[in-house]
From Swiss-Prot:
GO terms for biological process: protein transport. It holds the Pfam family DotM_C. Its main location: membrane. The T4BSS is a complex nanomachine composed of several subcomplexes. This subunit is part of the Type IV Coupling Complex (T4CC), a subcomplex composed of the DotLMNYZ core and the IcmSW-LvgA adapter subunits, linked by the C-terminal tail of DotL. Six DotLMNYZ hetero-pentameric units may assemble into a hexameric nanomachine, forming an inner membrane channel for effectors to pass through. Interacts directly with DotL. It comes from Legionella pneumophila subsp. pneumophila (strain Philadelphia 1 / ATCC 33152 / DSM 7513). Component of the Dot/Icm type IVB secretion system (T4BSS), which is used to inject bacterial effector proteins into eukaryotic host cells. Part of a subcomplex which recruits effector proteins and delivers them to the core transmembrane subcomplex. Forms the interacting surface for recruitment of acidic Glu-rich motif-containing effectors. The gene is dotM. Coiled coil: none annotated. It is found in: Cell inner membrane. The chain crosses the membrane at residues 18-38, 99-119. Keywords: Cell inner membrane, Cell membrane, Membrane, Protein transport, Transmembrane, Transmembrane helix, Transport, Virulence. This is Type 4 apparatus protein DotM.
């Protein structure tokens, strides 16, 4: 049984090997019958195409031989034209058509050569030259085009990265011994530090900044960004983009033109949407954070669109950068916690509500293990 099945499979395999041959034979037979049955229609169609080609060429050549070929194709009965005669007429017209076709192909080759991506993009860029070119397409990067941030210390200067919770606690001397040191500590044993809650409350309260007293009392950068957010809240993207574009360009010159925001501010500061936001917050930072949040109902408003703000007003930058995050940076944990509390209550609060910021800092510090030597450096 197994031998018979194997023989059948071999036989079917050999039969399949002849399939291309049979397909070619079938195509020839089909072509023959099509020519035999539809001979006059094929000749008529081919002659029609060649007549139009010949007429087009003869408009420029005015050649009598070509005119004769046109007359011949128009007067011949398709039923009397055989295959050889049709090919002869097509070749005669083709002798004239080859030249315009060659010209067209040369033009297309030239176009294809110039549109080739590999040949078009032959200039090599490094990061400096690329950002220098792209700053006109992306004006938001203008403030950092001349900066060499890669070679700078990420923990120093106006462009320094945000402090981690432990770095923040060390900077403001908020750490204290939380675990009692053992009389005979085990070598390599790790412990955790605690937070001076009173000092932490003072630091986070100071982060809140000034009370809200109207847009005219805001800093120039807060005033300008408020106008941007108001414009987006009222679906005026052109005005918002214009303010940001002007600020990007003028910041590079060292003199940011914040006055560009004044017309937009006057137009929208008394609108119902803006006044509804302002009425629910007591601090400048919390008001502007809610303006940004409301502006995002019109679409994306990333903090990367106002990079110039970071070296100008670091606290406002990080406050706006944290809008939309679940967890803020320690540098703005106080105003962020207060902002969340005001949003939850639906009204303004002059009393700092920063307990959640203190609790979050404690949790973050507890996650960092310290060696006994590091613990000894801390005060109780």
């Amino acid at each position: 049984m197994y031998i018979e099945m194997a023989q059948q499979q071999q036989q079917s395999g050999s039969d399949n090997s002849m399939a291309p041959v049979w397909i070619v034979i079938l195509l020839f037979i089909t072509a023959y019958f099509v020519w035999a049955l539809a001979h006059q229609y094929i000749v008529s169609f081919v002659f029609t195409i060649n007549i139009w080609q010949a007429r087009l060429v003869n408009l420029f050549l005015n050649n009598q031989l070509l005119a004769n070929q046109i007359y011949l194709m128009q007067t011949l009965d398709p039923n009397t034209v055989n295959w050889d005669q049709m090919v002869t007429v097509m070749r005669a017209v083709g002798d004239y058509m080859r030249y315009p076709v060659i010209c067209i192909l040369v033009v297309l080759a030239f176009v294809l050569y110039n549109s080739n991506v590999t040949l078009k993009y032959r200039k090599t860029y490094d990061m400096k030259s690329l950002r220098a070119q792209e700053q006109f397409n992306w004006p938001a990067i203008m403030p950092i085009v001349k900066e060499d941030l890669v070679s700078q210390d990420v923990n120093k200067g106006p462009w320094a990265m945000a402090l981690t919770p432990m770095e923040f606690a060390r900077k403001y001397n908020l750490l204290r011994k939380d675990d009692a040191l053992l009389d005979n500590p085990v070598p390599g044993e790790e412990m955790t530090a605690g937070i001076r809650r009173g000092d932490a409350k003072r630091v986070f309260t100071m982060q809140l900044g000034p009370y809200w007293d109207g847009f005219e009392r805001c800093s120039p950068q807060a005033y300008a960004l408020s106008a941007v957010f108001m414009a987006r809240m009222n679906r005026d993207r052109d005005a918002a983009n214009n303010i940001l574009k002007v600020l990007d360009k003028t910041f590079v010159d060292g003199k940011p033109d914040f006055s560009v925001a004044r017309p937009v501010m006057k137009k929208y500061q008394n609108s119902e949407l803006v006044q509804e936001v302002v009425a629910k917050h007591a601090y400048v930072l919390t008001v502007i954070a809610s303006l940004l949040e409301a502006a995002r109902e019109d679409g994306v408003v990333p903090s990367s669109e106002f990079l110039w703000l970071k070296p100008v007003d670091r606290r406002l930058w990080y406050m706006l950068n944290c809008v939309g995050r679940q967890t803020p940076y320690s540098e703005v944990a106080g105003p962020f916690a207060h902002w969340k509390a005001e949003k939850e209550m639906g009204r303004r609060s002059l009393v700092p509500m920063i307990d959640e910021a203190i609790r979050a800092l404690e949790i973050a510090v507890k996650e960092v293990r310290l060696t006994p030597r590091q613990m000894e450096e801390l005060e109780p």
